[in-house]
Amino acid sequence: MSEKGTRWRPLELFSAYLPAALSVLLGACLYITFSVGQWRSLDVPSWDLAIFTEAAKSYSHFQAPIVPVKGPGYNLLGDHFHPILVLLGPIYRFFPSGLTLLVVQDLLIAVSAWPLVRLATKQAGWLLASIIGIGYVTAWGFQGAVASQFHEIVFALPMLAWASAAFVEGRWVATMAWSAPLVLVKEDLGLTIMMIGLILSWRGRDSIKSFAYPLFFAAFGVIAFVVTIKLLLPAFNASGTWAYSLDGSQGRGNVTLIERALWPSQKFGVIAMAVLGAGIIGLASPWFWVILPTIAWRFLGSVDYYWDWKHWHYNAILVPILLGALLDAHRRWSEREQSDISRGLGWVISRQRPFVATVALAIPCAAALITAPQLPMWKMTNPGFGAVSSRMAQVQEINSLIPENANVETDL
């Protein structure tokens, strides 16, 4: 190796990993700062944190996740199927606080930036990758998740991020390996696995083996979903049923499936942000359609929280998938492959595709910047954000009066 090559190699390694490392660090700092601010100001958007804190406490003592907040003797595995939450047990044992769960969630979201920003660095260089990383960690879906506090779906984010990167790189086995544990996160993610299997089969259709094996993976996802909602959830639920329903027609009268999917109009906000999150050109990647099962159950459901794009945790799971679709389209456009993408979008002539692909990488970051004032973390610009609530002393006094292991009934 030449002296020049030896001298520049450390710099090349530094620039190769720096955007991903800084993205993870930026995300962790932003999220944890926001969570600590919420904690200090007693900002409680829902009862989810109390529910999952009780589950973590039970797991930390090697007990079933009995959650009195949901009802006497209520087993949380009968609500949603999320056995992966057992991983919270050892952490909670050493740091027994609801704030622990918030920090765990913040770190899991931040870490999910690593594989995708690393991939972006390989494809587009450190500068564009840095822009992508900023857009990723400040994305609409993640802000809503952090603000609404802990939810089990956060465990799916690193899995989907690494699966997305593997898909773009054409590593089918790795894609399936990273996706398979999704069945341990939440019951509906079996349908996401089904979609991933179908997409892999489509992408590998030129080979019998590459076409057939992903179909078995898709079947695994369907079977996992059916077994979970028909057998496992009813077994843990006191009423012997699945606590939720795919029927979203309640309260909507006699409407068609299309009307249920597209009405009310606030759903278009989610669609618009998804398109921007994929840099527009990501729609041409088959990976974009991995979001379809999640979008379907949300839009067909009757709970208006499902349709919101600014708040709650429901959009977080879309973010790594959308960036994966963008990077997949970018790779193929940049290489000027005569692929399904170039044929499907023939209005973009061959010499324009690399330029359009490069510009598209900045769209998610631009969307994050434009929508920032409407998103939860904008609160951090307020001078009083994170100040200790005036009610804190009263809360601490009341807590001191409650005996250990006593149950207290209250509202939010």
Locate predicted features.
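Perimembrane helix-loop-helix junctions
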Residues: 1-7, 192-219
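Extracytosolic helix-loop segments that constitute the early lumenal/periplasmic catalytic or substrate-binding loops
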Residues: 51-75, 83-84, 206
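Signature aromatic-anchored transmembrane alpha helix within multi-pass, membrane-resident enzymes
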Residues: 21-25, 127, 218-222, 333-375
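Hydrophobic, aromatic-rich transmembrane alpha-helices
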Residues: 267-295
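Specific aromatic-rich, kink-prone transmembrane helix
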Residues: 115-118, 135, 154-178, 193-197
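Start-transfer (signal-anchor) and selected internal transmembrane alpha helices
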Residues: 1-33, 172, 212-217
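Transmembrane-helix motifs of polytopic, lipid-linked glycan transferases
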Residues: 99-123
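Hydrophobic/aromatic-rich transmembrane helices and adjacent perimembrane loops
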Residues: 289-347
